[in-house]
């Protein structure tokens, strides 16, 4: 990636489609892409739940910050984990980035997508009430660092158009 180009960083709650959209944008625009959680799992040779179990959420957030620092220098598009804004250092890095895109979606739709996903340690087997509470605790931090907020319940093409329009109009 050319260091003069700022990466497009996708943030948002679990299940909003950050990975799907990131892959779509990268493929359609011939840009480099990385899914931060997937990158962490590969580099650490463990799944995200295994990392959480081994070193706890605080330990994971430290790893997440280290890999985020590396990835913002190397990739055009980065999809992050839903809890990236929980780590203060990662939050600070994201706050300095000009193209942070917040993908948002109705919590009930998200609940249906993620409630039984064993790869999401903060969501697996949680009630809708518990997920709403977690979502609510993160909204202000997403909002604080987002360049734009888009509704991810629309088509990938429409999302791409909304994002590109916002970037061009910047």
Swiss-Prot record:
ATP binds at residues 15-20, 120, 154. Binds 1 Mg(2+) ion per subunit. It comes from the Bacteria. One of its GO terms (biological process) is chorismate biosynthetic process. It catalyses: shikimate + ATP = 3-phosphoshikimate + ADP + H(+). Substrate binds at residues 37, 61, 82, 138. CDD domains: SK. One of its GO terms (cellular component) is cytosol. Pathway: Metabolic intermediate biosynthesis; chorismate biosynthesis; chorismate from D-erythrose 4-phosphate and phosphoenolpyruvate: step 5/7. InterPro entries: P-loop_NTPase (IPR027417), Shikimate/glucono_kinase (IPR031322), Shikimate_kinase/TSH1 (IPR000623), Shikimate_kinase_CS (IPR023000). Its EC number is 2.7.1.71. Keywords: Amino-acid biosynthesis, Aromatic amino acid biosynthesis, ATP-binding, Cytoplasm, Kinase, Magnesium, Metal-binding, Nucleotide-binding, Transferase. One of its GO terms (molecular function) is shikimate kinase activity. It is found in: Cytoplasm. Mg(2+) binds at residue 19. It is an enzyme of class 2 (transferase). Its cofactor is Mg(2+). Monomer. Catalyzes the specific phosphorylation of the 3-hydroxyl group of shikimic acid using ATP as a cosubstrate. Belongs to the shikimate kinase family. This is Shikimate kinase. It comes from Staphylococcus saprophyticus subsp. saprophyticus (strain ATCC 15305 / DSM 20229 / NCIMB 8711 / NCTC 7292 / S-41).
């Amino acid at each position: 990636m050319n260091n003069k180009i700022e990466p497009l960083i996708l943030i948002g709650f679990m299940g909003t489609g950050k990975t799907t959209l990131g892959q779509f944008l990268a493929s359609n625009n011939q840009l480099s892409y990385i899914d931060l959680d997937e990158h962490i799992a590969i580099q650490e040779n463990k799944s995200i739940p295994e990392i959480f179990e081994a070193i706890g959420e605080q330990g994971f957030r430290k790893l997440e910050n280290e890999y985020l620092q590396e990835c913002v220098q190397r990739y055009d598009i980065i999809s992050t984990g839903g809890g990236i804004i929980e780590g203060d250092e990662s939050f600070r890095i994201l706050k300095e980035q000009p193209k942070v895109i917040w993908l948002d979606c109705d919590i009930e739709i998200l609940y249906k997508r993620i409630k039984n996903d064993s790869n999401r340690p903060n969501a697996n087997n949680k009630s809708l009430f518990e997920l709403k509470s977690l979502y609510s605790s993160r909204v202000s931090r997403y909002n604080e660092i987002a360049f734009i907020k888009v509704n991810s319940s629309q088509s990938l093409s429409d999302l791409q158009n909304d994002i590109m329009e916002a970037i061009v109009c910047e």
